[in-house]
């Protein structure tokens, strides 16, 4: 795939009503036209909150909007037929499809069970109370409406290591379930935040139970057969033992008809943790570059005070570009969400230019930046807040520029705290470009591009600058950009 470019086709507040799959099918042609060649779909499985579920409260992995469960047949995004129609439309446009895999936990159990649990210190999960509590917990999943179709696996308390609510006595908190697999506490090879970050929410799936890991492998084979997907986005992997995903990825790659594109969400701003995880899974997955996303957030807030020479310092794309998926925003970092770190709209064209036009990493584009979004939710103070996320002007042009001009050797000119630039040399088949951006005043860079670019006339592909630039006999010229803006200079006749 030439210059892979991923679009996250949803956000946390996408409207209810089952319209997303149909909307995506209608837009598939246009996505191909601007240069999107991979789409990350929201979780397609039935969630505990039914038609209102964003998809991360997984109830039934085998219900893609087919069974009347949790008050609805369709998911928030549509029914199974509409999902498959959307996937077919994408594939007809040579756009690869990534499914979102949410197997850290389950929610919305069908039945209670008598269980035994131990209280856990929420701030240090390694501190587990010796006292064992006899209680009831919602831990049994029978999926009565599906009635064994596709899978007859019944989930019970042996499949889980933790829970956040018990009854008789009624109590909320974090509780370690006592069963045949939890004698040593939580799983290893997880993030060390809170002492051990195995537990996140709901009924925490325990991968030490062999029947559980085999069921999740079976589900992967099933969902690939049902959807013919081209890869996966793996949710919340910092809470899942790395050894499981190493094993799972080996399995799905072995049974898939062609190599799968796999990217995992390990949300940490410590690049060392990301590199450790990549090592633990033998490099079998890419990771989202959370440190870079935070850099963009900080740069957008600080304006001209931010030193752009260091925008990539301490990021995954700098440390390990072959395993980095770069991004400006996602459904967790958007305003009012759990990992809120929004990038101010003025800076987004600069950020997208830095991930779309450089050779390092695979860039991910966020739905609201391409289409806009408006929504309301409660803020930290409990009051309702309205958020308007505008369409980022010229984002479609930047995506198109990636396919047309982001080719050849890359040279960086990160020699000024506010105005930086980079060039792509082009190849025999494809032209290159010069990218100049500034987080301060109007900027300019005098660049020597070499004899191949002697006496060429250049224009700003984005149209932010009206003048033309002409290189001299040595291929040297001064290229410009506006204050707080970016320009992509290309040869006039390409």
From Swiss-Prot:
EC number assigned by the record: 3.2.1.1
The cofactor note reads:
Binds 1 Ca(2+) ion per subunit.
Q: Which cysteine pairs are joined by S-S bonds?
A: none
CDD domains, from UniProt?
AmyAc_bac_fung_AmyA
Active site per UniProt: 235, 265
Instruction: Supply the enzyme class, top level.
Output: hydrolase
Which GO molecular function entries does the Swiss-Prot or TrEMBL record give? alpha-amylase activity; calcium ion binding
Which residues of this UniProt protein bind Ca(2+)?
104, 198, 239
Enumerate the subcellular locations listed in this protein's record, separating them with semicolons.
Answer: Cytoplasm
Main site of residence? Answer: cytoplasm
What are the required cofactors?
A: Ca(2+)
The chemistry this enzyme catalyses reads: Endohydrolysis of (1->4)-alpha-D-glucosidic linkages in polysaccharides containing three or more (1->4)-alpha-linked D-glucose units
Instruction: Enumerate the Pfam families for this protein.
Output: Alpha-amylase
Q: Does the keyword Protease belong to this entry?
A: no
Q: Which GO terms describe its cellular component?
A: cytoplasm
User: Quaternary arrangement and interactors, per the entry?
Assistant: Monomer.
Protein's name in the database:
Cytoplasmic alpha-amylase
Which organism is this entry from?
Answer: Salmonella typhimurium (strain LT2 / SGSC1412 / ATCC 700720)
């Amino acid at each position: 795939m030439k210059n892979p470019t991923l679009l996250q086709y949803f956000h946390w507040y996408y409207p209810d009503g089952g319209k997303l799959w149909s909307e995506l099918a209608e837009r598939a042609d246009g996505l191909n036209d601007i240069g999107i060649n991979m789409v990350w779909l929201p979780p397609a499985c039935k969630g505990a909150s039914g038609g209102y579920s964003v998809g991360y409260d997984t109830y039934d992995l085998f219900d893609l909007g087919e069974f009347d469960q949790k008050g609805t047949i369709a998911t928030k995004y549509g029914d199974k037929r509409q999902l498959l129609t959307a996937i077919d439309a994408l594939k007809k446009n040579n756009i690869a499809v990534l499914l979102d895999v949410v197997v850290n936990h389950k929610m919305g159990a069908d039945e209670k069970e008598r269980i035994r649990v131990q209280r856990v210190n929420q701030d240090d999960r390694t501190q587990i109370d010796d006292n064992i509590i006899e209680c009831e917990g919602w831990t049994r999943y029978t999926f009565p409406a599906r009635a064994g179709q596709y899978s007859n696996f019944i989930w019970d308390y042996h499949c889980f290591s933790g829970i956040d609510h018990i009854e008789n006595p009624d109590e909320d908190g974090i509780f370690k379930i006592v069963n045949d697999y939890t004698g040593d506490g939580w799983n290893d090879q997880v993030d060390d935040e809170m002492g051990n970050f195995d537990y996140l929410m709901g009924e925490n799936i325990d991968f030490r139970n062999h029947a559980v890991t085999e069921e999740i492998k079976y589900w992967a084979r099933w969902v690939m057969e049902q959807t013919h997907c081209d890869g996966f986005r793996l949710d919340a992997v910092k809470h899942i033992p790395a050894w499981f995903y190493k094993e799972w990825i080996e399995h799905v790659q072995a049974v898939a008809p062609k190599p799968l594109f796999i990217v995992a969400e390990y949300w940490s701003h410590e690049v060392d943790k990301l590199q450790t995880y990549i090592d633990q899974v033998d490099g079998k997955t890419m990771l989202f570059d959370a440190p870079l996303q935070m850099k963009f957030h900080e740069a957008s807030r600080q304006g001209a005070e931010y030193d752009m020479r260091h925008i990539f310092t301490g990021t995954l794309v700098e440390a390990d570009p072959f395993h980095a998926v770069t991004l400006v925003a996602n459904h967790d970092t958007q305003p009012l969400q759990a990992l809120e770190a929004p990038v101010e709209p003025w800076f987004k064209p600069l950020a997208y230019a830095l991930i779309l036009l450089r050779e390092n990493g695979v860039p991910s584009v966020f739905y609201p930046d391409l289409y806009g979004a408006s929504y309301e939710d409660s803020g930290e103070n409990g009051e309702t807040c309205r958020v308007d996320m505008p369409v980022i002007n010229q984002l479609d042009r930047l995506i198109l520029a990636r396919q047309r001009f982001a080719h050849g050797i890359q040279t960086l000119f990160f020699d000024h705290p506010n105005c930086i630039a980079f060039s792509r040399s082009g190849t025999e088949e494809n032209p290159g470009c010069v990218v100049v951006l500034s987080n301060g005043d109007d900027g300019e860079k005098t660049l020597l591009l070499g004899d191949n670019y002697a006496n060429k006339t250049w224009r700003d592909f984005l149209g932010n600058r009206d003048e033309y630039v002409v290189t001299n006999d040595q291929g040297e010229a001064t290229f410009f950009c506006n204050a707080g803006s970016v320009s992509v200079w290309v040869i006039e006749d390409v």
